[in-house]
Regions:
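Acidic, mature catalytic/reactive cores of soluble proteins
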Residues: 1-198
Length: 198
């Protein structure tokens, strides 16, 4: 925990050094999340953090060593593709975990429930995805409530696979650049002008 909030786009003005660097609940207790919860959180938030082309935002990252930081409009198709793979891999790991351990439910912070939203209508709308992410990050901008929810591993797996498959289909449909004669390539990213550049 620190001053950064909303995926590095805002500051938690209620945070100070006395609060410390550990996430706390509304009751002041340190919140201890699981590693799995953290992995889900990182990947699900990235799914919703998209630009106008519905690809994951760069947030000023120098992803291609070209120093095009692209803070406002930068989007990475390559990162989006990688996260699609992550979501599928996490779903596979959950299946393996359930088969090996019998664990069929995952406990997570109640604020995360909205990140498990689903449906093509949501997925296809960058505005709706950004709004959902903003709602989530607002819920835990300073503290989390401390309440927990139990979600079946099967429900989480299905959710992750659905998101991964949507991402891959989206890239196939929207990011292929044809050079004719059945040749072409996939766009790699969008620059700070919103142009497909690679």
């Amino acid at each position: 925990k620190d001053l950064q909030t909303k995926r590095g786009t805002a500051h938690d003005n209620n945070w100070d050094h006395a609060y410390g660097n550990k996430q706390r609940t509304a009751g002041g207790n340190i919140y201890f999340g699981t590693i799995l919860e953290h992995i889900l959180l990182q990947n699900l938030c990235a799914f919703y953090d998209v630009g106008e082309h519905n690809e994951m935002r760069l947030h000023g990252a120098d992803w291609n060593d070209a120093l095009d930081m692209a803070w406002e409009k930068g989007e990475s198709v390559a990162f989006t593709c990688a996260y699609a793979g992550n979501l599928k891999d996490i779903a596979d790991c959950l299946k393996h975990m359930e088969e090996k351990t019998g664990i069929s439910k995952i406990e997570m912070a109640e604020e995360m429930k909205c990140l498990l939203a689903e449906g093509t209508e949501l997925y296809e709308s960058p505005d709706r995805k950004q709004k959902l992410l903003d709602e989530y990050t607002s819920l835990c901008e300073h503290n989390v409530k401390g309440g927990m929810i139990l979600v079946s591993t099967e429900q989480i797996r299905k959710n992750l696979v659905e998101k991964a498959e949507w991402l891959m289909q989206h890239i196939r449909e929207k990011e292929w650049i044809s050079a004719g004669d059945d040749m072409g390539w996939f766009n790699g990213y969008y620059d700070n002008h919103g142009n497909a550049v690679e």
